[in-house]
Amino acid sequence: MTIVFQLTMFALIAISFLLIIGVPITFASPDGWSSNKNIVFSGVSLWIVLVFAVGILNSFIS
């Protein structure tokens, strides 16, 4: 169970870094938001799911 928690935590950190870098680039690029908003929304949705997954898995680890 610990390895699942660690992999989920790693995925959360990786998606967080991608969003930190990707969202400002999307907003700064010309016509970036209208052509890439589905990707941004998918990334944010995945991030929210991972936050809840880490919270649930943490209750099994502790």
Curated annotation (Swiss-Prot):
Main location: plastid
Bilayer topology: Multi-pass membrane protein
Cell location: Plastid, Chloroplast thylakoid membrane
InterPro entries tied to this protein: PSII_PsbZ, PSII_PsbZ_sf
GO CC list: chloroplast thylakoid membrane; photosystem II reaction center
TM regions (residue ranges): 8-28, 41-61
Gene Ontology biological-process annotations: photosynthesis; photosystem II stabilization
Record key words, sorted: Chloroplast, Membrane, Photosynthesis, Photosystem II, Plastid, Reaction center, Thylakoid, Transmembrane, Transmembrane helix
Similarity comment text for this entry: Belongs to the PsbZ family.
Subunit structure: PSII is composed of 1 copy each of membrane proteins PsbA, PsbB, PsbC, PsbD, PsbE, PsbF, PsbH, PsbI, PsbJ, PsbK, PsbL, PsbM, PsbT, PsbY, PsbZ, Psb30/Ycf12, at least 3 peripheral proteins of the oxygen-evolving complex and a large number of cofactors. It forms dimeric complexes.
UniProt-listed NCBIfam families: PS_II_psbZ
Function statement: May control the interaction of photosystem II (PSII) cores with the light-harvesting antenna, regulates electron flow through the 2 photosystem reaction centers. PSII is a light-driven water plastoquinone oxidoreductase, using light energy to abstract electrons from H(2)O, generating a proton gradient subsequently used for ATP formation.
Protein name stated in the entry: Photosystem II reaction center protein Z
Organism (species): Welwitschia mirabilis (Tree tumbo)
Name of the gene encoding the protein in the UniProt record: psbZ
